[in-house]
């Protein structure tokens, strides 16, 4: 069995300012997305320029942070938000919802499309290959924070989280890093390397992420304040992923 390494969540301090690994992971994700987008524009000679790319990443970053935090409080911890609304601003403590962030990015993309006259699916297809890198970084942030641990297990790589209990658990953050980050990145990046019907790359991302999340969540301990939310075995993350899967299937079929 393995033991969680108990990593200090603070990467470094600048005087009174403490810089957390969790925040750095998001910064790495946004910078990585810009670099990948820049490479795709140059390599595939896409009809994008650097100003558009920078604006898209900026809009998306706001959508991810605002939507992710608000989504977490609404989907996962509504009672805490009602009684202590100021916790909404404690982003460094963790507590971000991918699905809330996705809704934030959808709104950001809509505003971006209005400004630059691009279609929503064009933007979706462009940004989809850039997202998994950020997801991978975010899951590493979860692991460093020692949050979102897995269910009790007897597999040889089970990990004991001393701050939780003395039982070995699935390192589910690392499963999600591998599925939603690495595997999804390879899938989307390779698929988007050739010209596709508009909307297809976006559809594949929606389906791919939903499937990866449905699988990974089956190893993850449900949030203590929620437990299983449907049929006695579905977590909130799985429930929120089902509409993604259905929309992805519909979009894939519509753009065949």
UniProtKB/Swiss-Prot annotation:
Its EC number is 2.5.1.145. PROSITE patterns: LGT. The chain crosses the membrane at residues 19-39, 56-76, 91-111, 231-251. Pfam families: LGT. A 1,2-diacyl-sn-glycero-3-phospho-(1'-sn-glycerol) binds at residue 139. It is a multi-pass membrane protein. Keywords: Cell inner membrane, Cell membrane, Membrane, Transferase, Transmembrane, Transmembrane helix. InterPro entries: Lgt (IPR001640). Belongs to the Lgt family. NCBIfam families: lgt (TIGR00544). This is Phosphatidylglycerol--prolipoprotein diacylglyceryl transferase. It comes from Legionella pneumophila (strain Paris).
